[in-house]
Amino acid sequence: MIEAIALREHPELCDAAIAYFQATWASDASLMVYDDCIRHSLTTENLLPRWYLLTDDGAIIGCAGLITNDFISRMDLYPWICALYVEKSHRGRALGQRLLARAEADARRAGFSAVYLCTDHIGYYEHYGYTHIGTGYHPWGESSRIYEKKL
């Protein structure tokens, strides 16, 4: 059975989640960013950050996060959905939407009226109700499209 689960509800998966996020998103220089952030997210009383896993009978097949900022210039906007990923072997079945929906629901319950994300993908997020609202700039000199979804 495929499920989108919140890591806060399954802290026993912490090490596996960190390894998955690192393998999927991190460079050698950023390995500890995921380790430190995910570990501390399990014990904070703050609303954010939150991390999610997509599992198929216990095997991790995808991930996402809900964070205060995704290393982008628009720090006036939050929360941000980040690190959305579904294994290639499981794509084409709207499984990414399950992760988006889980993060959106948590943001709504926390009192947020919108969520944001930055990406270079055009067409995917629009399919799930996201609207392109502008461009943001990253500290490493690149830019990304910014999307918003009203909750």
Predicted features, each with a name:
Residues 109, 113, 119-143:
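Conserved active-site alpha-helix within GNAT-family acetyltransferase domains
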Residues 86, 92-105, 117:
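Conserved acetyl-CoA-binding loop-helix of GNAT-fold acetyltransferases
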Residues 1-17:
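A short beta-loop-alpha structural element at the N-terminal edge
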Residues 49, 142-146:
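Short hydrophobic/aromatic beta-strand or adjacent loop that forms the aromatic wall/cage
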Residues 53, 59-69, 80, 85:
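Conserved beta-strand in the GNAT
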